[in-house]
Amino acid sequence: MYKRQDYSIPTPDGTDLDLKQYEGKVIMIVNTATGCGFTPQYEDLEQIYHDCHDKGLEIIDIPCNQFKGQTPGTDEEIHEFCTLKYHTEFPQMRKSDVNGEHALDLYTYLKGQRPFEGFGRGAKAFAMSVMLKRIDRNYKSNPDIKWNFTKFVIDRAGNVVARFEPTADMKDVRDCVEGLL
């Protein structure tokens, strides 16, 4: 179990979002991109947020440009894109790294709690596996975030209970969240 007060996330206005303020809530943390094949997941994320926020869910959007540069633009441009195209209302943080030496401390912790377990089955999972093998033949053996729209779900007690790869069915993500509320 982590202590929420141990982690903060930089916001676009230069302040930090202290996770302690979400004590007792279910949190979904997701690294996002505006120019990715998975970007339409914003629609599902916003629907989950709309349906579950009043029951105790928070979604934290962390834009990331580490995967083929699919999050170009400033924080302001990213925010404008998300709010105009997908009507997102959940908090969006400053564009940040999720892997490597500049990764947010929170992501280092999350990956340690829920390492990569595969993309599942289906055409998207197969395509992701083929692509990543070209980049790193040993991609399966490290806990790093593999692509945009990887989601971590944290229960009300602060336990990291799930990691969903971008290929996961959003119904499974919703079911997990609703089961914790």
Enumerate the language-model features and the residues they cover.
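Short, small-residue-biased leader/transition segments that mark boundaries at the very start
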Residues: 1-2
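A short beta-strand-turn-helix
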Residues: 7-26, 47-52
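Conserved helix-turn-beta segment immediately C-terminal to the redox Cys motif
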Residues: 25-26, 34-63, 82-86
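Thiol-based oxidoreductase modules, predominantly thioredoxin-like and allied folds used
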Residues: 56-73, 89-100
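Thiol/selenol-based redox catalytic cores and closely related redox-interacting motifs
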Residues: 81, 87-167
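Non-catalytic, surface beta->alpha helical segment in thiol-disulfide oxidoreductase systems
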Residues: 161-181
